[in-house]
From Swiss-Prot:
The gene is addA. Transmembrane segments: none annotated. It comes from Streptococcus thermophilus (strain ATCC BAA-491 / LMD-9). Residues 26-487 form the UvrD-like helicase ATP-binding domain. It holds the Pfam family PDDEXK_1. Keywords: ATP-binding, DNA damage, DNA repair, DNA-binding, Exonuclease, Helicase, Hydrolase, Isomerase, Nuclease, Nucleotide-binding. It catalyses: Couples ATP hydrolysis with the unwinding of duplex DNA by translocating in the 3'-5' direction; ATP + H2O = ADP + phosphate + H(+). This is ATP-dependent helicase/nuclease subunit A.
C-alpha cells in the first residue's frame, strides 16, 4: 500500500505561494488549497455559490488516495443520489487518468484497486448508508435483513390509520375518557370527525422522527414550553417593557406634536386630551404615580373615538399634510396600545386556565407515545419500514453496541459531508457516531439552506461556524467566496441586495465582506452594461387582486407572463438561444399557465421533471370525449367537445344555431333536428353548417357501427385515419409529444382489452374512475426539444447554472405572511415543543345566560413558536432568493407585479447599520417589497440593479411579437396532401440528388468536430468511387428515417452480444491491465473482472489471443518500455476537408503508443471479423494516418510506426500499416 505524508501547515503555505507565482490562467485560490490539503482536525468549508466546492471535494479525495488512503476508508455523504453518482463518475475518470500516468507497478495496482472499489465505497446519501448498516447489523435489534422500505404513501397512510383508529377507540373508552374527549374537541371543534386531531398526532409523530431520538424528544421536549410557561410572569414583563418602550415613544410623540399644535391649531378641542395624556404619561413614567395597567386603560379611554384625533380642516397644504401624518402615527400608537391591552387580557385568562391545559396536553403526549410504539410494532410485524425508522435503527446500533461503532471509527480516515447546511439532527447524530472526533470534513453554505420543510436545520451549520470562528482549536473554518460562475453584473446585484438585507437576525448569517461574492477570474470582471440586473414589474392595480389570489400558492398573472415572453423574444432576436434561458418559479403551480402561453407564442418550453397529466393533455382529452360521444351521443359535454374539436371545427355560432332548434332536450336531439330541418328555427341552418352536420352525423354513425364489432384499438386508429387527427397534431407545436400521447392511447386500449375486459363502455368507465380518483395513467416520456427555454423551481435549480435567468413571481407572499400561514391550531418547535390554541370556557368569568362561552386563546408557547417559526420562514425565503439570484451567469431578471404608485411610495429611507431596519425586513411579505424597500432606502449605485415598471399598453400582441413556427395543418385539407403523382415524380428526381448528397456528405454536412471513425465512414464512398456515374446506380441508396418509432419492451429476451460490445470490453481490458515483466492469464482474468460489461460480453473476450500478443515482437517491445507507454490517450488536431476545403477539428482516443527516443510506436486494437489482414489494413489506413499525424505534430517527431493488432480472425495478427 502507498504511504505518503500529508502536507504540514508550512508546506500548505508554500503550495499557496507557488500557485500565486504560477502563470496559470485559472489559479487555485489560497482558500481552495487550504480546503484540499488541510488535515488533522475537523474542517468546515463555507462555500459560497459558484465557488467550486465540488471541485475541492474531488481534489481532496484524490489527494488522500494519492497518499495511500483507500476509497473504502472514506465516508462521503451527499444530499442526493444523483450527486453521489456524479461524484463517483468524476472520481473514476480522474483515477483512470492517474492510472495511465502511474510510474510504478505498485502505484498502478493501488489505483486500479481504488477504481474497482468505487462502486461499493460509502459514497451516497445517508439513507443509503443506514440501510446498508441495518442490513448488516440489524439482527442486534431483532430486525430482519430482508426488510422492505415502505415508499408508497398510500401504504403508510393505511397502516397509520389502522393503528390510530384502534388506539383512538381505546382512549375514548379508557379511564381518562372525559379528558380525552375535551382534548379531541379542542382541535376538532364542532366537526363530526376527529380528522383534525388525527392530523395533529401525525404531525407530532413526523416532527419527532426528524430528531435523533424520537421517544426522548416526545418525553422531554413536546411539553417543555407549556411546562415552563408562566402567564403571570409574562404579564409583568410585558408591563415593564412598556415603560421604556412604547409609552416612552408615545410621550415623546405627543410632546413634539403639542408644541406645534398649540401654535397652529390653538382652538382645536383634541388638544385638551393630548395634554391630559401627556400628564398621565409623565406621572407614570417619571414620577411612578400610576400603575401601568391603570395607565394603559386611561390612555385607551382618552383616545377612544376621536379623543386624540385632529379634526381641523386647515387650508394650508403643508398643515394639511402635517395633520394627516399626525393622525396616521397616532392611530398606529393607539393600535399598539390596544394590542397590548388584548395581550394582557389573554394572559390573565391563561393564568386562570393554565392548570387545565397541562393535564390535557400530558394526555396528548401519552397518546402520541403509544401511537409511535404501536405503529412501529405494526411495521416490525410486516418487516417493512420508513426511511426514518432505518436511520433510528442505525443510531441505536451504534449507540448500544460500542464495538460496532469503534469498527466504523477505525475504518474511516475521514467523514465527509456535502451540503452540510441541509443536515437534519438525525443525520448529524450519525456523523458524530461515525467520526473519531477530529476527522470530519463538512462543506456547505448557510446562505443556501432551503430545506426546512425536510426538517433540515441550518442552525447545525451555524453553530459549527460560530464555534470554529471563535475557537480555532475546535476546528478549522475555511471560507470560499470567489465565484467562478457569474459575470460581475450578477455578482454586484447579489451583493447589493444581500449586504443590505441579510444578517444574523434575518437570514441567520451576517452578509458582510467575509461572505460577499468575489469574481474568481479577470474575464468575469469585464464590464457588460447591457447585462445589468433588471427588476421588471408589471404595473397593475392592486385592488383588482382578491385575497384568495394572494399567498404562497398564488397564480402567476397573464401580465407577468407576457412581460417575460416579450423579453425572451427580444433576447432571441439578439441571437440568444432558447436553451440559454431559464425561468425559476417558486413552485409548480405556474407551470401550466406558462406552458400554454409560451406555446401560443411559438417559444419551446421544457419544465424540469414536470409531472404533466397524461389524461389532461388536450389531444388525449379530445379523443376521450370522442369515445364518450361514440358510446353515448346523449352525453352533452362529450358531444359538444367533439363538435368543437379540430376534427369537425364547429364554432360558437354553429353551436348556437343548433341549440335554438329546441327549448329543451339533449344537444344530440337538437343536432338531428338541425340536420333534418325539423327544429324550431330551420331557417338559421345555413348551407355551410348543413354540410358540417351531414359530415358529422354520417361519421359518428359510421364510428358507432364500427365500435360494435371491432376492438377499441382499431376504432381509435379509424378515428385518427378518417379525420386525419394523428396527422393534424403532427403540425402543432410539440408535435412529437402529442403524437406519442395519441399512439400510447391506442396501445393502452389494446392492453386493456387483452386483460379480458371488452367494450367501449367499460374502457371509458375505467378512465373516468381514474380521473375521479385524482390519479393518472403513466405519462408518456416527454420528447424534449433540445433548443428550449427551461423552467424549474428555485429548489430544483440549486447547484445549477444558466446564462440568462428570470426569477418569477417576486410578488408572491411568504408563508408566514399569507392568509393561511401559521394560522392553524398548533405550531411545533424543536426546543419548546407544542404550542396550541386553547378552547377556554369563560362562562364563569362573564355574566351570561349561555350554557357555554367558548373562546379560543393562544397559549404562550403558541405565540413564542409562531414568532420563531415566522422569523425562520422569512430567513429561509431570503436564502431562497439568494439561491435564485446566484444561478445566473450573464444576466438576471427579477419579475413581479404590483402598483407603481404603491410600491414607490410605501417605504421610507430608514437605515440601521447599513441595512434595512429589522422591523421593516420582518414585516415585509414578498421578495418584491424587499427590493423596492432597498430601492427607496439606498442609492442605485450601491444596489447595482434597475427597476422598470411595464404597462399593459406595452404588452399588446404586436408589441410582444411572435416566434415563427410551422403553421398547423387543417385536417380537412390533409386528404389532398397525400403522395400524388406529382410528388412521386418529384421523389424520383430527388433520388439522384440524394445519392449525390450521400456521396459528398463530408463537404455538404461538415460539422466543426469529427472523430476518425466518422471520417472513415464519410470518406469511404469518395475513396471507393470515381466520377459521378453513381447517379445511374440503383443499389445502395438508403432511405432517410424521419418518422418517430415506438418500441415496446421485449421482456425475457436474452441480450444480444454485438461485436461492438466485445470490442469495447477488449479495449477497456487492455486499458486496465497492469503490465509487468511477464503478463499471465491470471493478470488478464483479473483485469477482465474489473471491466464494466455484462458477463455475456466478457465471455466473448478471447484472453488466449491477448496473452499471445505479448509473445509478439510488438508485445515484447511494450513490456520492455512500460514506463514510456501511454494508453487511451485523447488527441485533437486541425484537418482540412478535401471536398469543401473547410477546416475542422478531429478529436479521438488513441488505444496506445510508445514514446521512444527516436520514434513513436502507435498501435490500435481491432476486433472486426476478417479473412485476410489486408482488408482491415486498407479499411483503417486513413484512421491510423490521422493518429500518426496528430502524434507527429504533438511531439515534433517525424517517425511514427503504425500497427494494427487484429483480434477478429482465426489467429491473432499484428500488421504494420
Amino acid at each position: 500500500m502507498l504511504t505518503k505524508a500529508f502536507l504540514s501547515p508550512a508546506e500548505i503555505e508554500e503550495r499557496i505561494a507557488q500557485e500565486a507565482a504560477s502563470d496559470k490562467d485559472r489559479k487555485l485560490t489560497p482558500e481552495q488549497i487550504e480546503a484540499i490539503y488541510s488535515n488533522g482536525t475537523n474542517i468546515l468549508v463555507s462555500a459560497s455559490a459558484g465557488s467550486g466546492k465540488t471541485f475541492v471535494m474531488v481534489e481532496r479525495i484524490l489527494d488522500m488516495i494519492g497518499r495511500g488512503v483507500g476509497i473504502d476508508q472514506l465516508f462521503i455523504s451527499t444530499f442526493t443520489v444523483k450527486a453521489a453518482g456524479e461524484l463517483k463518475e468524476r472520481l473514476e475518470k480522474r483515477l483512470t487518468k492517474h492510472l495511465g500516468q502511474a510510474e510504478t507497478d505498485e502505484e498502478r495496482a493501488f489505483l486500479s484497486d481504488q477504481i474497482a472499489k468505487i462502486g461499493t465505497a460509502d459514497i451516497g446519501t445517508m439513507d443509503a448508508f443506514t440501510q446498508k448498516l441495518v442490513n448488516q447489523y440489524g439482527y442486534l435489534l431483532g430486525v430482519s435483513p430482508t426488510f422492505r422500505i415502505m415508499t408508497d404513501l398510500a401504504e403508510q397512510t393505511l397502516m397509520k390509520n389502522e393503528v390510530y383508529a384502534d388506539l383512538f377507540n381505546d382512549y375514548m373508552q379508557g379511564k381518562d375518557a372525559q379528558l380525552f374527549q375535551k382534548l379531541v374537541r379542542n382541535f376538532t371543534g364542532h366537526s363530526k370527525t376527529s380528522k383534525a386531531f388525527r392530523d395533529l398526532v401525525y404531525d407530532i409523530y413526523s416532527f419527532s422522527q426528524a430528531t435523533a431520538d424520537p421517544e426522548k424528544w416526545l418525553r422531554q421536549n413536546l411539553l417543555k414550553g407549556q411546562i415552563e410557561a408562566k402567564p403571570e410572569q409574562a404579564k409583568n414583563e410585558l408591563l415593564d417593557s412598556l415603560k421604556d418602550g412604547l409609552l416612552a415613544d408615545f410621550l415623546a410623540f405627543l410632546r413634539d406634536h403639542l408644541g406645534i399644535a398649540q401654535r397652529e391649531f390653538a382652538k382645536a378641542k383634541y388638544l385638551n386630551n393630548v395634554s391630559d395624556a401627556i400628564i398621565l404619561l409623565e406621572g407614570s413614567l417619571i414620577n411612578d404615580q400610576t400603575d401601568m395597567e391603570d395607565l394603559l386603560k386611561q390612555l385607551l379611554t382618552l383616545s377612544g373615538g376621536t379623543g386624540l384625533t385632529n379634526m381641523t380642516r386647515p387650508k394650508d397644504e403643508e398643515l394639511k399634510a402635517y395633520k394627516e401624518a399626525y393622525n396616521k402615527t397616532k392611530n398606529e400608537f393607539v393600535a399598539q396600545l390596544r394590542e397590548v391591552d388584548t395581550q394582557l387580557t389573554v394572559l390573565e385568562v391563561l393564568a386562570k386556565h393554565n392548570d387545565d391545559i397541562l393535564p390535557m396536553l400530558e394526555l396528548l403526549q401519552s397518546f402520541v407515545l403509544d401511537f409511535s410504539d404501536q405503529y412501529l410494532q405494526a411495521k416490525i410485524q410486516e418487516n417493512t419500514f420508513e426511511f426514518s425508522d432505518i436511520a433510528h435503527f442505525a443510531i441505536r446500533i451504534l449507540e448500544e453496541n460500542p464495538e460496532v461503532a469503534v469498527s466504523y471509527r477505525d475504518r474511516y480516515h475521514e467523514v465527509m459531508v456535502d451540503e452540510y447546511q441541509d443536515n437534519s439532527h438525525t443525520q448529524e447524530r450519525m456523523l458524530e457516531l461515525l467520526s473519531n472526533g477530529h476527522n470530519r470534513f463538512m462543506v456547505g453554505d448557510i446562505k443556501q439552506s432551503i430545506y426546512r420543510f425536510r426538517q433540515a436545520d441550518p442552525q447545525i451549520f451555524n453553530d459549527k461556524f460560530q464555534l470554529f470562528l471563535e475557537n480555532p482549536d475546535a476546528g478549522k473554518l475555511i471560507l470560499l467566496k470567489e465565484n467562478f460562475r457569474s459575470q460581475s453584473e450578477v455578482l454586484d446585484a447579489t451583493n447589493g441586495v444581500f449586504s443590505h438585507l441579510m444578517d444574523q437576525e434575518i437570514g441567520d448569517i451576517l452578509y458582510d465582506k467575509t461572505h460577499m461574492l468575489v469574481a474568481g477570474s479577470q474575464k468575469q470582471k469585464e464590464p457588460h452594461p447591457e447585462n445589468e440586473t433588471e427588476v421588471l414589474i408589471y404595473n397593475s392595480d392592486e385592488s383588482s387582486t382578491s385575497e384568495d389570489e394572494e399567498g404562497p400558492d398564488q397564480a402567476i398573472s397573464s401580465g407577468e407572463i407576457s412581460l417575460v415572453i416579450k423579453e425572451i423574444i427580444k433576447l432571441h432576436e439578439q441571437g440568444v438561444r432558447f436553451e440559454d434561458i431559464t425561468l425559476l418559479a417558486p413552485n409548480r403551480n405556474t407551470y401550466l399557465d406558462l406552458m400554454v402561453s409560451f406555446e401560443e407564442h411559438g417559444i419551446p418550453l421544457v419544465p424540469d421533471e414536470y409531472k404533466s397529466s397524461y389524461l389532461e393533455s388536450l389531444e388525449v382529452m379530445i379523443m376521450l370525449d370522442t369515445l364518450r360521444a361514440i358510446n353515448n351521443p346523449l352525453n352533452d359535454y362529450a358531444l359538444v367537445a367533439l363538435l368543437r374539436s379540430p376534427m369537425f371545427n364547429f364554432n360558437e355560432d354553429d353551436l348556437t344555431r343548433i341549440a335554438v332548434q329546441a327549448d329543451k332536450g339533449q344537444f344530440y336531439d337538437k343536432l338531428l333536428a338541425a340536420h333534418t330541418k325539423s327544429g324550431l328555427h330551420p331557417e338559421v341552418v345555413m348551407q355551410g353548417l348543413d354540410a358540417k352536420l351531414t359530415l358529422f352525423t354520417e361519421t359518428l354513425a359510421d364510428w358507432r357501427d364500427y365500435s360494435k364489432c371491432h376492438s377499441i384499438y382499431d376504432l381509435i386508429w379509424k378515428i385518427y385515419n378518417d379525420r386525419f387527427y394523428y396527422d393534424y397534431v403532427g403540425g402543432l407545436p410539440r408535435a412529437e409529444q402529442r403524437q406519442a400521447n395519441l399512439y400510447a392511447l391506442a396501445l393502452r386500449a389494446n392492453a386493456y382489452e387483452k386483460t379480458g375486459f371488452k367494450g367501449l363502455s367499460r374502457f371509458i368507465g375505467m378512465i373516468d374512475k381514474i380521473i375521479a380518483s385524482g390519479n393518472d395513467l403513466e405519462e408518456v416520456t416527454d420528447l424534449v426539444p433540445k433548443n428550449a427555454v427551461s423552467l424549474m423551481t428555485i429548489h430544483k435549480s440549486k447547484g445549477l447554472e444558466f446564462k440568462y435567468v428570470f426569477v418569477l413571481q417576486m410578488n408572491r407572499k411568504f408563508i408566514g405572511h399569507s392568509k393561511d400561514g401559521l394560522s392553524g391550531k398548533y405550531i411545533i418547535n424543536r426546543e419548546k415543543g407544542l404550542g396550541i390554541k386553547y378552547l377556554a370556557d369563560l362562562k364563569d368569568q362573564i355574566n351570561t345566560n349561555l350554557p357555554k362561552l367558548n373562546v379560543v386563546l393562544e397559549t404562550l408557547t403558541f405565540q413564542e413558536n409562531r414568532r420563531e417559526e415566522r422569523r425562520a420562514s422569512i430567513s429561509e425565503e431570503m436564502r431562497l432568493l439568494y439561491v435564485a439570484m446566484t444561478r445566473a451567469e450573464k444576466k438576471l431578471y427579477l419579475v413581479g407585479k404590483g402598483s407603481k404608485e404603491t410600491l414607490t411610495q410605501q417605504y421610507g429611507t430608514n437605515v440601521e447599520n447599513n441595512r434595512l431596519p429589522v422591523a421593516i425586513r420582518d414585516q415585509i411579505a414578498t421578495y418584491q417589497d424587499w427590493i423596492m424597500a432597498l430601492d427607496t432606502a439606498f442609492m442605485r449605485k450601491d444596489l447595482k440593479f434597475t427597476v422598470r415598471f411595464v404597462e399593459a399598453e406595452e404588452l399588446t400582441p404586436e408589441a410582444i411579437g411572435q416566434v415563427e413556427v410551422q403553421a398547423a395543418v387543417d385536417a380537412d385539407d390533409l386528404s389532398n396532401n397525400r403522395q400524388t403523382e406529382d410528388i412521386k415524380r418529384a421523389l424520383t428526381v430527388l433520388e439522384s440528388v440524394e445519392k449525390l448528397n450521400q456521396l459528398y456528405a463530408p463537404a455538404i454536412d461538415l460539422p466543426s468536430v469529427r472523430t476518425p471513425s466518422q471520417l472513415k465512414t464519410l470518406y469511404e464512398p469518395i475513396m471507393d468511387t470515381e466520377g459521378v456515374d453513381i447517379m445511374d446506380k440503383k443499389e445502395g441508396v438508403q432511405p432517410l428515417e424521419t418518422a418517430s418509432t415506438f418500441e415496446l419492451p421485449d421482456f425475457g429476451q436474452k441480450t444480444k452480444v454485438t461485436g461492438a460490445a466485445v470490442g469495447s470490453a477488449t479495449h477497456e481490458l487492455m486499458q486496465r491491465l497492469i503490465l509487468s515483466d511477464k503478463v499471465t492469464l491470471q493478470d488478464l482474468t483479473q483485469a477482465l473482472s474489473r471491466v464494466s460489461a455484462d458477463d455475456q460480453v466478457k465471455a466473448r473476450v478471447q484472453l488466449e489471443k491477448l496473452l499471445g500478443f505479448f509473445d509478439t515482437e510488438l508485445g515484447k517491445l511494450i513490456l520492455a518500455n512500460r514506463g514510456k507507454l501511454r494508453r487511451e490517450a485523447p488527441f485533437a488536431m486541425l484537418a482540412e476537408d478535401p471536398a469543401s476545403k473547410e477546416d475542422f477539428v478531429v478529436r479521438g482516443i488513441i488505444d496506445g503508443y510508445l514514446l521512444l527516443e527516436d520514434r513513436i510506436v502507435l498501435f490500435d486494437y481491432k476486433t472486426d471479423h476478417f479473412t485476410h489482414p489486408s482488408e482491415l489494413k486498407t479499411r483503417y489506413q486513413g484512421q491510423m494516418s490521422l493518429y500518426a499525424k496528430a502524434l507527429s505534430q504533438a511531439y515534433q517527431m517525424e517517425k511514427v510506426d503504425k500497427y494494427l493488432i487484429l483480434l477478429g480472425g482465426k489467429d491473432l495478427e499484428v500488421v504494420e500499416v
